[in-house]
Amino acid sequence: MSLNAETKAAIVAEYAQSEGDTGSPEVQVALLTASINHLQGHFKAHKGDHHSRRGLLRMVSRRRKLLDYLKGKDLARYQDLIKRLGLRR
């Protein structure tokens, strides 16, 4: 259920702060958001897949923590990221 390499590379290129940046909070949140959106389609077809749902909740929690970190560090970057990803917060 993971993203393919081309999709990941495109997301990293779009949200990276500098060349080769894969660890900034923006990139991590964007990758988690893409994975979460990908898994939502899986759960529409497989409602009883509770094992994968636990992984989804873990990803959502990790994204929430990264967003909270970014909000405390730099509010402008946080608001820009929320707007670019279309998250409701």
Swiss-Prot record:
Q: Which GO terms describe its biological process?
A: translation
Q: Is Isomerase given among the entry's keywords?
A: no
Q: Which SMART domains match?
A: Ribosomal_S15 (SM01387)
Q: Name one GO molecular function term.
A: rRNA binding
GO cellular component terms, alphabetically, are:
cytosolic small ribosomal subunit
Q: Could you name the domain of life of the organism this protein comes from?
A: Bacteria
Q: Which UniProt keywords apply?
A: Ribonucleoprotein, Ribosomal protein, RNA-binding, rRNA-binding
Kindly give the InterPro entries that the UniProt entry links to this protein: Ribosomal_uS15, Ribosomal_uS15_bac-type, uS15_NS1_RNA-bd_sf
Q: Which family does it belong to?
A: Belongs to the universal ribosomal protein uS15 family.
What is the purpose of this protein? One of the primary rRNA binding proteins, it binds directly to 16S rRNA where it helps nucleate assembly of the platform of the 30S subunit by binding and bridging several RNA helices of the 16S rRNA. Forms an intersubunit bridge (bridge B4) with the 23S rRNA of the 50S subunit in the ribosome.
PANTHER family associated with the record: RIBOSOMAL PROTEIN S15, BACTERIAL AND ORGANELLAR, SMALL RIBOSOMAL SUBUNIT PROTEIN US15M
* Annotated protein name in UniProt: Small ribosomal subunit protein uS15
